[in-house]
Amino acid sequence: MTLLVGLGNPTLRYAHTRHNAGFDILDSLISELDLSFTFSSKHNACLCVYKDFILLKPQTYMNLSGESVLSAKNFYKTEELLIVHDDLDLDLGVVRFKNGGGNGGHNGLKSIDLLCSNSYYRLRVGISKGMGVIEHVLSKFHKNEEPLKNAAFEHAKNALKFFIESHDFNAMQNRFTLKKPLKIES
């Protein structure tokens, strides 16, 4: 089994903020597959079992995401872990993949690294840098950023669909990496 985790913060206060990119992409995937999340108090997360994947949205708040991930990872005895998360070191519209490595200062990844190790796959979605890291990651996208954000999130969702069917991280990485943002017609 593979644990596929979208990072974000629970509650309406943080809905659709830059830091909730992982939640939003998983929500879009679940909707397209005509599935739904259910809350698991055991893992303090919303989860959905689909094929041989456990899709998970930790409800611990970002800085404690590792608690939910570790709980689900141990319970389901998953072999692979893929984390979908925002990355402020990437421009808005960029989608990249990584296997292992550092957390880049991302508190959700720090929590996962501490409790689970840093040996997992990542789908990184660029949100660009802004003035003041905390304010920026907890802010919503500006209206003029929405078309590019939507295109990048759709691209990331399609990458996840490909991964669910192929179980091939390297093929997903080769096919879906966007080093530069997509061109959006106005």
UniProtKB/Swiss-Prot annotation:
Predominant subcellular localization, coarse grouping: cytoplasm
Record: residues binding tRNA: 14, 61, 63, 107
Reaction catalysed by this enzyme: an N-acyl-L-alpha-aminoacyl-tRNA + H2O = an N-acyl-L-amino acid + a tRNA + H(+)
Recorded superkingdom: Bacteria
Enzyme active site: 19 (proton acceptor)
Subcellular location per the Swiss-Prot or TrEMBL entry: Cytoplasm
Site (Discriminates between blocked and unblocked aminoacyl-tRNA): 9
GO molecular function, one term: tRNA binding
Biological role stated in the UniProt entry: Hydrolyzes ribosome-free peptidyl-tRNAs (with 1 or more amino acids incorporated), which drop off the ribosome during protein synthesis, or as a result of ribosome stalling.
Designated name of the protein: Peptidyl-tRNA hydrolase
